């Protein structure tokens, strides 16, 4: 709710934050199914896809990407834009930052991320970690909307953001990558100067896109 409030203040837009089913009780694809239901609800209410910006942080960043990919797979209109804060895009955990930033990130650990991905995939799943359904970094990203990606230099998931921005650019998706010095996972929720700067940047990005 902290980030939802900050998004509303920085963008001047209405913000809908929804609860979705969580792992391990509700593993993949429960979360994406719930997100699609919310998308369908917004469309049913007469809110056009081009009037919606989908935002998410951490696992929510993964969900935001997977929602856009699911909408694309259904042949439907994309949201106006994506705003991703420290998104989790690569469940293979092979990015360089998983080792280089292990001692720097005060929020996440390698073991914690491993336990989260195992819970999210589900005990009976046969999906590989590089499957785009789990790791949107490896998806066909063409046709996705303009995307703002924010990440801190000190976070384990830094590679997820850097590699996503690179993949999007290579696939002709407009992507803006912002890397904030000495910041950690989802630093935007904290009362620090870099968080204020990041939220101001989100506001500028949204107003430019709209």
Put a short name on every predicted segment.
Residues 1-210:
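Alpha/beta-hydrolase superfamily serine-hydrolase fold, recognizing
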């Amino acid at each position: 709710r902290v980030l939802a409030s900050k998004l509303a203040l920085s963008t001047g837009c209405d913000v809908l934050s929804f609860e979705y089913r969580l792992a391990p009780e509700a593993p993949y694809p429960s979360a994406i199914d719930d997100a699609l239901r919310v998308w369908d609800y917004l469309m049913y209410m007469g809110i056009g896809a081009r009037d919606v910006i989908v935002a998410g942080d951490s696992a929510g960043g993964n969900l935001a990407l997977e929602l856009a990919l699911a909408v694309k797979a259904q042949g439907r209109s994309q949201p106006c834009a994506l705003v991703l804060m420290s998104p989790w895009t690569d469940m293979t955990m092979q990015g360089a930052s998983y080792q280089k930033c292990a001692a720097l990130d005060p929020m996440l650990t390698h073991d914690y991320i491993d336990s989260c991905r195992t819970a999210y995939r589900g005990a009976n799943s046969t999906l590989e970690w590089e499957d785009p359904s789990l790791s949107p970094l490896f998806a066909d990203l063409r046709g996705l909307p303009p995307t703002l990606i924010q990440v801190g230099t000190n976070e384990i998931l830094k590679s997820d953001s850097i590699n996503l921005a690179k993949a999007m650019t290579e696939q002709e998706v407009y992507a803006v990558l912002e890397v904030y010095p000495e910041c950690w996972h989802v630093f935007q929720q904290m009362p620090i100067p870099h968080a204020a700067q990041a939220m101001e940047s989100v506001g500028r990005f949204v107003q430019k896109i709209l």
